Each structure stands twice: as C-alpha cells, then as structure tokens.
Amino acid sequence: MAQSSGHVSYVAVTVPIAIVMTVLCLFLANAVTYARRPTTYIVGGDDGWDPVVPMDTWARGKTFYAGDILEFKYDYQRFNLIVVNRTGYETCEANVGAIEYSSGDDKIQLNYGYNYFIGTYTPEDCTTGLKMAIKALAPR
C-alpha cells in the first residue's frame, strides 16, 4: 500500500501542473492571435503630404503605437520631409541632427516613447500646417 500511496502523490502533483501549463499555453496562444499588428498610415490620406491638409488636424484623434508606420507620399520636386526636434518644429527650421527625406514616398517606423516632430524645409508650407507632432505609445 505504501507504494500505491507514492504513485498517487506523484499523480496528484503532476496532473494539476499539466492542467495549469495547458491553460497557460492556451492563454498565451490566444494573446498572440489577438495581438495588435502594426498599422501603416498614409499621412494626409488621399492628398498625401501636402499643405492642403493641415497635418496636425489629420493626426488628431489617431493613436500611434510603436511599430506603426507613417508613409509620406508627396511630390518630391515640390516638397520634402524632415524630422526635427521640438524647437525646429515650433520655428519651422531644421535643427542640427534633423533627418531629411526626399524620395516622394518615405516611411518612418515609430519607436516606443519617442516624440516625433515632422515638418518641411519650406517655411511658408511649414507655417501653414505642413508639420505634425506625435508620440508613439507602447504597443498593445
């Protein structure tokens, strides 16, 4: 009988562990299945990166997450795109270290916790709204 009791104790311990592990695996599989995939945004919508669309208005109401992609479509002969610091954003001037894009179809993948200040070198376009400020939140 003592041997039988040892076997029962072993089963009594391992079966609940196996059940807990199975439930945990199912929970994780479900979480992965429903994990948010990055979203690609065409900045400015159908009009693209153009002063006819006030970009802060376009961005208002949208929530951006790390991993999301901002795609900027524009006429590269008329416009460009620069990522600047807050001062550059407020003054519509490129700061030291600003990153310029000029292909006409540029993509920026957002990193968690970063504030993005994006504008154009053309001061008159920048001051009339061809700029935007966003922050990338933690992915969900």
Swiss-Prot record:
SUPFAM superfamilies cross-referenced by the UniProt entry: Cupredoxins
Glycosylation (residues): 85
Family matches, as CDD domains: Plantacyanin
Cystine pairings recorded for this chain: 92-126
Residues annotated as domain Phytocyanin: 39-138
A GO molecular-function annotation: electron transfer activity
Keyword Signal: yes
InterPro entries found in the cross-reference section: Cupredoxin, Phytocyanin-like, Phytocyanin_dom, Plantacyanin
First and last residue of the signal peptide: 1-28
Function: May act as a carbohydrate transporter.
Membership in a protein family: Belongs to the early nodulin-like (ENODL) family.
Protein name per the record: Early nodulin-like protein 22
Organism (species): Arabidopsis thaliana
